[in-house]
Every structure is written in structure tokens, then in C-alpha cells.
Design a protein with these regions (language model features):
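Acidic/proline-rich low-complexity IDRs
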Residues: 2-4, 20, 84-86, 149, ...
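Acidic, Ser/Thr- and proline-rich intrinsically disordered linker/docking segments
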Residues: 21, 112-113, 117-179
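Short, Lys/Arg-enriched N-terminal segments with co-localized hydrophobic residues
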Residues: 1-18
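Intrinsically disordered, low-complexity N-terminal regions enriched in serine/proline/glycine
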Residues: 11, 46, 56, 60-62, ...
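Phosphoinositide-binding peripheral membrane targeting modules
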Residues: 78-84, 91-131
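Anionic N-terminal interaction surfaces
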Residues: 20-89
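Short, surface-exposed beta-strand/loop "edge" segments at domain boundaries and coil↔beta transitions
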Residues: 67-72, 95-98, 105-107, 139-151
Length: 179
């Protein structure tokens, strides 16, 4: 009887080990929070360099997609350009500031300000991509895509932002989007 219990315990341990392995495979990659926190700190530094009173803004990472379609007879396809963005928002002034950057956060561009009182319209587009769309005027727009976390470090900033994204979405939908 004791021998049977020892074998059963060993079998249960092996089953748990195998199930743990499968659950990790199906769960997907785990977020490296140390790397994510370091990148969030770099985002803050770049944003504060670019934006006066940058500390007054909360931040998320976002990106834009520019898709160009081509048709060369039998060859059809598309080419997508990704633009990385540090997106800051201030609830009191109802302002969104977008600062272009690169995936490794080694540099930044100049900020663009979108004040609620000065834009033509803003809305959340659910299809074909989940994007926050802002039209500052009739001639142009920006579509900001944002997710909790994206794993491809060659294309996107590596940062986990579930809580921040929820706060930005709430601000955008309740205080910034036009009806």
C-alpha cells in the first residue's frame, strides 16, 4: 500500500509538471516586468524632455500604422509602416500629446498637441483595428492603436500597460471623444 502511494505521488508530480508546461505554452509568453518598468521610465524621461510640465500627463505607449497597397499585375500585397508613439493625456486640460519615438526608446520627435476644444472630432474605431482616432482638422487625422502589451520588440516598445490603457480608454471615451 505504501509503495502504491509513492508511485501515485510520483505520477501526480509528473502530471502536474506536464500540465504546468502545457499551461505555459497555451498562456503565451510572460511579461518581463523589469524590462517593462525600465522602458516605462525611459518613456517618461523622453516625454518630459519634449513636453513642458510633462509630469502633469499620464502615459501609454501607442503606435500608428500606415498601410500601402500595391498591385503589379500578378503580384498584389501591402506594405505596413509602424510609427511608435508616447501618448500623454491630461484630464484637467482635456489634452492629448503625442511624441514619436522608436522601439528601443533611443530618441524622440517633436510633440503634437490635441486639445479637446480645438479638434474637429475624435472617436474610437473598433473595426478593422481598435484605434483611437483624432481629426484635428478636415485635412488630416491620427489613429492611435494601443494594447496592454505587445511582444515584438523590433516593432514596438516593450511595456506592459493594462492599468494605464484602461485609464486612457476611460478618459478618451468619457471626456475627449466627440459625440
Amino acid at each position: 500500500m505504501i509503495l502504491f502511494l509513492q508511485i501515485k505521488t510520483k505520477t501526480n508530480f509528473q502530471e502536474e509538471k506536464i500540465m504546468g508546461l502545457f499551461s505555459k505554452l497555451f498562456k503565451g509568453p510572460e511579461i518581463d516586468m523589469e524590462k517593462s518598468d525600465a522602458n516605462a521610465k525611459k518613456m517618461r524621461e523622453l516625454f518630459d524632455q519634449a513636453v513642458e510640465n510633462g509630469d502633469d500627463y499620464r502615459l501609454i505607449f501607442g503606435y500608428t500604422e500606415d498601410v500601402n497597397w500595391f498591385n503589379y499585375g500578378f503580384v498584389h500585397g501591402s506594405k505596413t509602416k509602424i510609427g511608435n508613439l508616447i501618448v500623454g493625456w491630461n484630464e484637467d486640460s482635456q489634452t492629448i500629446v503625442v511624441v514619436p519615438t522608436v522601439p528601443d526608446l533611443s530618441g524622440r520627435g517633436e510633440p503634437t498637441y490635441y486639445r479637446r476644444s480645438e479638434i474637429l472630432k475624435a472617436y474610437r474605431n473598433k473595426y478593422p483595428t481598435d484605434a483611437f482616432v483624432i481629426y484635428p482638422n478636415k485635412k488630416g487625422y491620427i489613429g492611435i492603436n494601443a494594447y496592454d502589451w505587445l511582444d515584438d520588440e523590433k516593432l514596438y516598445v516593450y511595456v506592459s500597460q493594462e492599468e494605464e490603457l484602461a485609464a486612457f480608454t476611460d478618459f478618451f471615451m468619457k471626456r475627449f471623444a466627440t459625440k
